[in-house]
């Protein structure tokens, strides 16, 4: 049976969020304090190791089974000229993923991640959200379920990413509705549109917000009206990972925006998440502040497709390597520490 077979099932999952293992956190902190280094000298690497311990429920977490899940979908509003590329590029890039030729293929391989690409009805774009809800209830639940289906017990880490021409416009709409602010504060160049393209994006988001102004302010309604299938897929994967206590690495603006309507209502939804990076999309840093996430990397990336999150896995692996591999003071014969 689908994890999100009904709206009630989705709402129940959002209301019943497991928490990290407090005993594992305590044990991991104790181990950090015993390692042959001054306390705090490895900075955020120490925090990452403790974070991973809490969600894996062990003092010495590992990443033996890591997965990158990339969701793809198309959007009806692209008819308004919001992207530098046609919608056909979404399917072309999915083909490139399958052929092993994309950045995420290289980066997932380098990070030791199993790559899964989930194409969601690419030949059936969402409705134009300036005149209708992007998805009906059934479509949104199906996309959420597709996200949940890629998350399996036994995974040690999940990376989420997306591909969908025009979806930075949907992300801007989700953020503006969830956190306020003008569309101009959230809309950026995306795949590289010029000032005229950004103006078109702002206008489209303004029209969408106006059309849906009287809609219920619930996570599901905001997601189905202003999101997209790949965006709902990311949300479903993150929510299922939480149920299974699997830590998640979020990618850029769009992946994080998938959580905006959920986090605006239930801020704790991001407790099991790390922000892999801060992208060059202007709205991303503002969104990360709302989500309460501090990015691991900031390299000026704006590709999407899980690329920044996959790259950040190397930092997480380094955190676990030091946490698990360093000698303790007792093992090294250092009596009084440093």
UniProtKB/Swiss-Prot annotation:
Active-site residues (renumbered): 305
Keywords: Cobalamin biosynthesis, Glycosyltransferase, Transferase
Signal peptide: none
Keyword Glycosyltransferase applies: yes
UniProt GO BP: cobalamin biosynthetic process
Metabolic or biological pathway: Nucleoside biosynthesis; alpha-ribazole biosynthesis; alpha-ribazole from 5,6-dimethylbenzimidazole: step 1/2
Reaction(s) the record says it catalyses: 5,6-dimethylbenzimidazole + nicotinate beta-D-ribonucleotide = alpha-ribazole 5'-phosphate + nicotinate + H(+)
EC number: 2.4.2.21
Domain of life per record: Bacteria
Gene Ontology MF: a single term: nicotinate-nucleotide-dimethylbenzimidazole phosphoribosyltransferase activity
Function statement: Catalyzes the synthesis of alpha-ribazole-5'-phosphate from nicotinate mononucleotide (NAMN) and 5,6-dimethylbenzimidazole (DMB).
NCBIfam families registered for this protein in UniProt: cobT_DBIPRT, PRK00105.1
Family per record: Belongs to the CobT family.
Protein name as it appears in the record: Nicotinate-nucleotide--dimethylbenzimidazole phosphoribosyltransferase
Organism lineage: Bacteria, Pseudomonadati, Pseudomonadota, Alphaproteobacteria, Sphingomonadales
């Amino acid at each position: 049976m689908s994890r999100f077979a009904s709206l009630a099932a989705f709402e129940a999952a959002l209301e019943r969020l497991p928490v990290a293992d407090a005993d594992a956190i305590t044990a991991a902190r104790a181990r950090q304090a015993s390692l042959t280094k001054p306390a705090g000298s490895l900075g955020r690497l120490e925090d990452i190791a403790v974070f991973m311990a809490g969600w894996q429920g062990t003092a010495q977490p590992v990443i033996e089974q890591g997965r990158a899940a990339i969701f793809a979908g198309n959007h009806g509003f692209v008819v308004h000229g919001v992207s530098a590329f046609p919608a056909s590029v979404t399917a072309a890039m999915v083909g490139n993923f399958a052929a092993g030729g994309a950045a995420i293929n290289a980066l997932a391989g380098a990070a030791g991640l199993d790559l899964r690409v989930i194409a969601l009805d690419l030949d059936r774009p969402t409705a134009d959200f300036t005149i209708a809800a992007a998805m009906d209830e059934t479509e949104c639940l199906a996309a959420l379920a597709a996200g949940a289906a890629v998350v399996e017990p036994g995974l040690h880490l999940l990376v989420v990413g997306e591909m969908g021409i025009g979806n930075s416009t949907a992300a801007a709409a989700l953020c503006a509705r969830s956190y306020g602010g003008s569309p101009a504060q959230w809309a950026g160049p995306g795949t590289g549109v010029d000032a005229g393209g950004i103006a078109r994006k702002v206008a489209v988001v303004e029209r969408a917000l106006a059309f849906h102004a009287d809609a219920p302010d619930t996570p599901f309604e905001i997601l189905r009206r202003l999101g997209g299938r790949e965006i709902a897929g990311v949300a479903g994967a993150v929510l299922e990972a939480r149920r299974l206590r699997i830590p998640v690495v979020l990618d850029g603006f769009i992946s994080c925006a998938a959580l905006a309507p959920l986090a605006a209502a239930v801020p704790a939804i991001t407790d099991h998440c790390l922000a892999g990076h801060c992208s060059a999309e202007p709205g991303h840093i503002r969104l990360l502040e709302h989500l309460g996430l501090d990015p691991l990397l900031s390299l000026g990336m704006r590709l999407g497709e899980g690329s920044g999150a996959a790259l950040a896995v190397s930092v997480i692996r380094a955190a676990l390597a030091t946490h698990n591999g360093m000698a303790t003071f007792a093992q090294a014969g250092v009596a009084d520490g440093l």
